[in-house]
A protein has these predicted regions:
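Short helix-coil boundary/hinge micro-motifs
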Residues: 1-151, 158-159, 196-199
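Solvent-exposed, flexible loop/coil residues
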Residues: 20, 123, 165-166, 191
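Short acidic, gly/pro-rich beta-turn/loop elements at beta-sheet edges
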Residues: 31, 162, 183
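Residue-level signal for short amphipathic helical patches enriched in basic/charged
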Residues: 144-147, 164, 179
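Short, cysteine/histidine-rich loop/knuckle motifs that typically chelate Zn2+
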Residues: 151-156, 175-177
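Histidine-centered nuclease catalytic patch
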Residues: 158-166
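Cysteine-rich micro-motifs
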Residues: 168-179
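Basic DNA-binding region of bZIP-type proteins
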Residues: 177-194
Length: 199
């Protein structure tokens, strides 16, 4: 779950979002097979949520995190994963993600250096940290990078990743693992099917 992304691979405005989406580990192949469900949830306790935010400089060590904060964070993460999943399929196959709103996480425009406007969270604490993540999504959307945040098509992976393909049609978090496993399975099915038809 702490698979860190090399800095040059994901644009800065979606790096934090990508890490947040991957606090849920749905991989079930290889070393991940048989992993207990509670270990798949990186935000399984208020303490784990606090540690995740503190580790990324989004929260001070003195901030107390409770179960309601954790549930809010999981809800935001799951909604963003659903939106990234919508980015992963052709437009004609998408479910409508419109209508989601996070009214309890206000964002404000602040003018920083050289009167440059910035979108920032209007609160502190956990809500402020979540607001920062949502602000990054808005910035990424304006730069065209949010549409490249996807969920791996491999049902035994479901890792969130940034699609680097020129055509923006990547399906796998890594071709050398998930893509190759898919191609191998497809080849074996095809081979079995042709052997069955011949016999």
């Amino acid at each position: 779950m702490e698979r860190r992304i090399p800095e040059g691979e994901v644009p800065e405005e979606v790096r934090l979002v990508n890490e947040f989406l991957n606090t849920l580990d749905l991989e079930t192949y290889g070393e991940h097979a048989g992993k207990p469900d509670e270990e798949r949830e990186g935000l399984r306790s208020p303490e784990r949520l606090r540690a995740w935010f503190v580790g990324r400089g989004l929260l001070g060590r003195e901030v107390v995190v409770n179960e309601a904060d954790r549930q809010l964070a999981v809800g935001v993460r799951d909604a963003l994963r659903s939106a990234a999943l919508a980015n992963s399929v052709p437009a004609r196959e998408r479910s409508d993600a419109a209508g989601w709103s996070f009214q309890e996480l206000p964002l404000v425009v602040r003018f920083g250096e050289n009167s440059k406007p910035e979108l920032v969270s209007g609160e502190g604490g956990v809500r402020g940290a979540l607001g920062r993540i949502l602000a990054d999504v808005v910035v990424a959307s304006s730069k065209g990078t949010w549409a490249r945040m996807k969920i791996c098509a491999a049902q035994d992976c479901r890792w969130a990743y940034y699609d680097h393909s020129k055509s923006r049609t990547g399906r796998w978090c890594a071709m050398e693992t998930c893509g190759n496993r898919h191609k191998t399975r497809r080849y074996r099915r095809k081979k079995r099917s042709s052997a069955w038809q011949e016999g």
